[in-house]
Design a protein with these regions (language model features):
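Mid-domain Rossmann-like dinucleotide-binding core that forms the NAD(H)/NADP(H) cofactor-binding site
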Residues: 1-33
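Terminal peptide-recognition signature
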Residues: 4, 23, 49, 61, ...
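Short, polar loop motifs at secondary-structure junctions
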Residues: 15-19, 37, 55-56, 76-78
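Short acidic-hydrophobic, aromatic-tinged amphipathic segments that line or gate anion-handling sites
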Residues: 30-34, 131-134
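N-terminal Rossmann-like NAD(P) cofactor-binding module of classical short-chain dehydrogenase/reductase
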Residues: 32, 47-50, 72
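A short acidic, Gly/Pro-enriched loop at the edge of an enzyme's catalytic core
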Residues: 40-48
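Glycine-rich phosphate-binding loop and adjacent beta-alpha segment
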Residues: 52-122, 156-158
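C-terminal hydrophobic helical "lid"/dimerization subdomain
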Residues: 107-158
Length: 158
């Protein structure tokens, strides 16, 4: 979201009620509470959908994509990853809509740009909680339940 904003995008964040304020603080122009509104049926269309949760079928978002829109799966459940791998390319051949996956490949220029954005204060990490290694199971449980607001960090030593 923060990177999209630096590129001039109008950003709509989709999150639960508990995370709305954080999403706004990261620069979202619009915030949709998925517990009250379904972005797949609300009539809005988007040029790009970045799906970091992958809690529902990839293709549920078809009607939310603009005619030449791009759906990008960024992590999530293995079931959705397989769905994208097997059907994304085939589905992309129909019409102008594209379905793809994002796989990060660290490279020096991109990392330098991220460091520059952090130095400028344009990009900031959101750390919601820190857990010592001895409490890693609790940290994972919080993430699995979707209760984490920001990143959960496991500290190995102080």
């Amino acid at each position: 979201m923060q990177i999209a904003k630096t590129m001039g995008a109008t950003v709509t964040g989709v999150c639960s009620t508990a995370k709305m304020e954080m999403v706004r603080s990261l620069g979202a122009d619009h915030v949709v509470d998925y517990t009250k509104d379904d972005v797949t049926t609300n009539g809005e269309t988007y040029d790009v959908i970045l799906d970091a949760g992958a809690y529902r079928s990839t293709f549920d978002y078809t009607r939310s994509l603009a005619p030449t829109g791009v759906y990008v799966l960024v992590g999530g459940e293995m079931k959705r990853t397989w769905q994208m791998l097997l059907l994304g390319r085939l589905r992309s051949k129909k019409g102008g809509k594209q379905y793809t996956m994002f796989v990060a490949r660290a490279n020096r220029p991109d990392l330098a740009k991220l460091a520059e954005l952090m130095d400028q204060g344009t990009l900031r990490p959101v750390i919601g909680a820190r857990y010592p290694l001895a409490h890693a199971a609790e940290a994972v449980s919080i993430m699995e339940q979707g209760k984490a607001v920001g990143k959960v960090v496991i500290t190995v030593s102080e």
